[in-house]
Curated annotation (Swiss-Prot):
Protein residues bound to Fe(3+) 1: 79, 111, 211, 272
Protein's UniProt name: Lactotransferrin
Activity under varying temperature: Optimum temperature is 25 degrees Celsius.
Family indicated by similarity: Belongs to the transferrin family.
4Fe-4S among keywords: no
Physiological role: Transferrins are iron binding transport proteins which can bind two Fe(3+) ions in association with the binding of an anion, usually bicarbonate. Lactoferricin binds to the bacterial surface and is crucial for the bactericidal functions. Has some antiviral activity against papillomavirus infection. N-terminal region shows strong antifungal activity against C.albicans. Contains two BBXB heparin-binding consensus sequences that appear to form the predominate functional GAG-binding site.
Binding positions for Fe(3+) 2 per the UniProt entry: 414, 452, 545, 614
Length: 708
């Protein structure tokens, strides 16, 4: 980070010694009024002795994005559409702070995109063709991306023949779309009011630019409809009698009063956000600056300078006037995760051909964790005729993120990860079902899931080892945050010891996903070359059920936390792997919570807990389609599928338990549409919630922000 010597405040200060260097944030502005406000902010912050700010001037938002990427500026506030652009190559900026709207009692990090019309104008949303339109600016959320995404079916747009702007120019009789190329699309600048070169400008030099500008375009009678945000009418017309002259167009082709925006809007849009570089981005310094600024100059804090206010005749300089403050965005959240899958889908719909959009909706993108799962997924994709395609990530958390972004649709998860995915807004779709002795006559797909037994396994020869003497022993875990391998045993241990120091109970462990430098990774081996040690995927030799049991079988650890089936699947000749083919079931014992030990045949009376079955999760808007496709896929490639084993088997792996557990008989339907809490059960959810009090994860922190 660069240090600088602040300029002396006045000539009278020349006799003073130079001040100590202070860290500086270079704020990017896109107009003369913004630059003047920034300079006033700069002066106020100097008086506080807080983080210093200097003001950088550029012509429009994209130039600010470039300046930040090139380290010629550090921060700027952007609308969601520009947050998306900023996050793309080559800029790779990320949002670091979100504006907060609403009220102090009910703060929100989103706003509503609305279509405003004058009362008495006789048309609905599906009758906009041939009308005159007012937009905040090209590429902006409420003014362009959302309405064009909704109007796309009416645009007669042939993607291969012309850009979207050309279709919009033909759809409306005239428009004002600031930031557009007025030479290429004169019709989209026809209503704009700027003079000369300023007509259609991407700043307040165009009077109809931005939210208030687009509404003024409607007020002045230039346009028939203004695409703005829900607060625009209230900010420009404080009197109810004046507001009553306007209405909102609703998606169901009705109209509503302007104060009914929660029921009548085009979309819910993420807040404007401050963006910075994702590497060397001065995030902490920017947040320190914003925190101090909102503390001193936020709503109703100061008469001399208002951070969320603009001079008469101006609106939304630097920040939206309607903002109440800022909320820091967790480091795990990039631009795509911040905007969310629905917003990103709208963007994709405007960038892809109709055929591409249809193909994206038809297929299911499965997320594979690690290279071995990716290999199996690609085989599945090929055999499915591309009805299933593959995305891949190195960790389960990263796969969950891909589903949240809409870059993948589904994956199969252990109960611990179902908890995380549920906290992030994903829903269970289908559950793994094993053979049942209780309901053997029922169709597997319709049979209730019974859960599985989480157990602690030790060598029979290690005679003195019981549940009560595990302290300072060596442990083998499937992975951090997984049910049988982590959540259940560590939850029990935390309850017994009252300590959250996970890495102090056992002398050494292999818990893939833990800090590689900690004791919890000391026993992990990585791949055949010793690389990727302790990663939570199949590159780590001791990852997963089979890996944790192997860690015990090879005398690396004293105890393995797995499921009951794991012992049976890897002993008495059930596995052909070199390390397992000579293992005898009788050589292992289960640890019971009462301090006794029992043979592995007695798991029903000697286990740590009954765990919920693994289940497929997806976004709620894709759940029904994912379910339909998977049921068809298992009819082809399931245990009794017509193409298994000849072509491909979903529930069979070259190693163990790739994509699905190998002992899965079928993917079963769930009764109704259960939430993740209903699927996991209150007892299990409570246990994990208590465990998470010890240590949360970056993904859970991110999702707590995204779902607030």
């Amino acid at each position: 980070m660069k240090l600088f010597v602040p300029a002396l405040l006045s000539l009278g200060a020349l006799g003073l010694c130079l001040a100590a260097p202070r860290k500086n944030v270079r704020w990017c502005t896109i107009s003369q009024p913004e630059w003047f406000k920034c300079r006033r902010w700069q002066w106020r912050m100097k008086k506080l002795g807080a983080p210093s700010i200097t003001c950088v001037r550029r012509a429009f938002a994209l130039e600010c994005i470039r300046a930040i990427a090139e380290k010629k500026a550090d921060a700027v506030t952007l609308d969601g559409g520009m947050v998306f652009e900023a996050g793309r190559d080559p800029y790779k900026l990320r949002p670091v702070a979100a504006e907060i709207y609403g009220t102090k009692e009910s703060p929100q990090t989103h706003y509503y995109a609305v279509a405003v019309v004058k009362k008495g104008s006789n048309f609905q949303l599906d009758q906009l063709q041939g009308r005159k339109s007012c937009h905040t600016g090209l590429g902006r959320s409420a003014g362009w991306i959302i309405p064009m995404g909704i109007l796309r079916p009416y645009l007669s747009w042939t993607e291969s023949l012309e850009p979207l702007q050309g279709a919009v120019a033909k759809f409306f009789s005239a428009s004002c779309v600031p930031c557009i190329d007025r030479q290429a699309y004169p019709n989209l600048c026809q209503l704009c009011k700027g003079e000369g070169e300023n007509q259609c400008a991407c700043s307040s030099r165009e009077p109809y630019f931005g939210y208030s500008g687009a509404f003024k375009c409607l007020q002045d009678g230039a346009g028939d409809v203004a695409f703005v945000k829900e607060t625009t009418v209230f900010e420009n017309l404080p009197e109810k009698a004046d507001r009553d002259q306007y209405e909102l167009l609703c998606l169901n082709n009705s109209r509503a009063p302007v104060d009914a925006f929660k029921e009548c809007h085009l979309a819910q849009v993420p807040s404007h956000a401050v963006v910075a570089r994702s590497v060397d981005g001065k995030e902490d310094l920017i947040w320190k600056l914003l925190s101090k600024a909102q503390e001193k100059f936020g709503k109703n804090k100061s008469r001399s300078f208002q951070l969320f206010g603009s001079p008469p005749g101006q609106r939304d300089l630097l920040f939206k006037d309607s903002a109440l403050g800022f909320l820091r965005i967790p480091s795990k959240v990039d631009s795509a995760l911040y905007l969310g899958s629905r917003y990103l889908t709208t963007l994709k719909n405007l960038r892809e051909t109709a055929e591409e959009v249809k193909a994206r909706y038809t297929r299911v993108v499965w997320c594979a964790v690690g290279p071995e799962e990716q290999k199996k997924c690609q085989q599945w994709s090929q055999q499915s005729g591309q009805n299933v395609t593959c995305a891949t990530a190195s960790t389960t958390d990263d796969c969950i993120v891909l589903v949240l972004k809409g870059e993948a649709d589904a994956l199969n998860l252990d109960g611990g990860y179902i908890y995380t995915a549920g906290k992030c807004g994903l829903v269970p779709v289908l559950a793994e079902n094993r053979k049942s002795s209780k309901h053997s006559s029922l169709d597997c797909v319709l049979r209730p899931t019974e859960g599985y037994l989480a157990v602690a396994v030790v060598k029979k020869a290690n005679e003195g080892l019981t549940w009560n003497s595990l302290k300072d022993k060596k442990s083998c875990h499937t992975a951090v945050d997984r049910t049988a391998g982590w959540n259940i045993p560590m939850g029990l241990i935390v309850n017994q010891t009252g300590s959250c120091a996970f890495d102090e109970f056992f002398s050494q462990s292999c818990a893939p996903g833990a800090d590689p430098k900690s004791r919890l990774c000391a026993l992990c081996a990585g791949d055949d070359q010793g690389l990727d040690k302790c990663v939570p995927n199949s590159k780590e030799k001791y990852y997963g059920y089979t890996g944790a049991f192997r860690c015990l079988a090879e005398d690396v650890g004293d105890v393995a936390f797995v499921k009951n089936d794991t012992v049976w699947e890897n002993t008495n000749g059930e596995s052909t792997a070199d390390w397992a083919k000579n293992l005898n079931r009788e050589d292992f014992r289960l640890l019971c919570l009462d301090g006794t030990r029992k043979p592995v045949t007695e798991a029903q009376s000697c286990h740590l807990a009954v765990a919920p079955n693994h289940a497929v999760v997806s976004r709620s808007d894709r759940a029904a389609h994912v379910k339909q496709v998977l049921l068809h896929q298992q009819a082809l490639f399931g245990k009794n599928g017509k193409n298994c084993p000849d072509k491909f088997c979903l529930f069979k792996s070259e190693t163990k338990n790739l994509l699905f557990n190998d002992n899965t008989e079928c993917l079963a339907k769930l009764g109704g549409r259960p939430t993740y809490e209903e699927y996991l059960g209150t007892e299990y959810v409570t246990a994990i919630a208590n465990l998470k009090k010890c240590s949360t994860s970056p993904l859970l922190e991110a999702c707590a922000f995204l779902t607030r």
